[in-house]
Regions:
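Extended, well-ordered alpha-helical scaffold segments
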Residues: 112-131, 170-189, 212-231
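Solvent-exposed loop and edge beta-strand segments that line ligand/cofactor-binding
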Residues: 77-95, 141-156, 183-198, 231, ...
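Extended acidic/polar, glycine-enriched regions
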Residues: 8-46
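Structured core of small recognition/catalytic domains
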Residues: 11-26, 96-147, 153
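Well-ordered alpha-helical scaffold segments within catalytic/enzyme domains
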Residues: 95-114, 158-172, 188-189, 198-217
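An acidic-aromatic substrate-binding cleft motif
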Residues: 31-126
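A general structural detector for well-ordered alpha-helical segments in enzyme core domains, enriched
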Residues: 22-24, 162, 182, 223
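Short, small-residue-biased leader/transition segments that mark boundaries at the very start
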Residues: 2-7, 229-234
Length: 237
């Protein structure tokens, strides 16, 4: 007998408008088990709330000029911003993701106070250009103050994505050009032999094509394809 004759699939649809954890007790064929379900709000609602929290609580407006406009880690227990030279607590690196999220949320019209969020993003964009990136060369630094004492290629995909999202939001060509220069710098620094997480080559090529930037499109495509050629194993006859 096949498994289909022994086990009959049963489906149960669980719906609840209230968020939170729910525990279901399941009994089938005298077998008992427990299932825990976490009901969350819709992704767009969560994204909007996250963006509002970033704008209201995670942007620096204090006395330190170097950090003006930065999105920083936030201590929910102490209710304070946190910034230290340590990699996971500085003003660079994965904090870029907060800027990416707000730019995408603005593109999708998810935010109630659009004007406030866009002003916040403008301030973060200015911080990014001033403290983390050399827009002329494409260099991406690990920490504010153009501090690149800790070299990290993983910062480049984040930066390319951020400037691409700003380009898509505002249509300002310099953001697209900056994304190209960062990509070129990534490969210049041995990015050919480095496997990055989420290097947005396809999105960059699509946006360059839309913008009619054929020369930059060819440059980016050639750089990416050269990575494939380098990665090919050597064949012996």
């Amino acid at each position: 007998r096949g498994l289909g004759d022994v086990y009959k699939r049963q489906e149960y649809l669980f719906e609840n408008e209230k968020t939170g954890e729910y525990v279901l007790s399941i009994c089938a064929d005298e077998v008992k088990t427990t299932c825990r379900l976490l009901v969350q709000e819709r992704p767009e609602t969560l994204a909007a709330k996250r963006c509002a929290f970033i704008v209201d609580h995670q942007q620096y407006h204090g006395k330190i000029k170097e950090l003006q406009g930065a999105y920083l880690p936030y201590d929910n227990e102490e209710k304070i911003l946190v910034c230290t030279p340590e990699n996971d607590f500085n003003a660079g690196r994965e904090r870029t993701g907060m800027g990416v999220l707000i730019a995408r949320a603005l593109q999708q019209n998810l935010l109630k106070d659009r004007e406030k969020a866009e002003q916040s993003l403008r301030e973060y964009h200015a911080f990014y250009l001033r403290e983390l990136v050399n827009a002329a060369t494409g260099l991406v630094c690990n920490c504010s103050g153009k501090d690149n004492s800790y070299f990290r290629l993983y910062n480049y995909p984040w930066a390319v994505t951020f400037f691409l999202e700003c380009w898509k939001l505002w249509g300002e060509k310099e953001n697209l050009k900056t994304a190209v220069r960062i990509t070129e710098k990534f490969y210049e620094q041995d990015g050919f032999r480095f496997y990055p997480i989420e290097m947005p080559i396809v999105m960059l090529c699509q946006e360059l094509k839309k913008a009619g930037e054929q020369e930059d499109l060819k440059t980016v495509r050639d750089l990416f394809l050269s990575l494939i050629h380098i990665s090919e194993p050597t064949r012996h006859s």
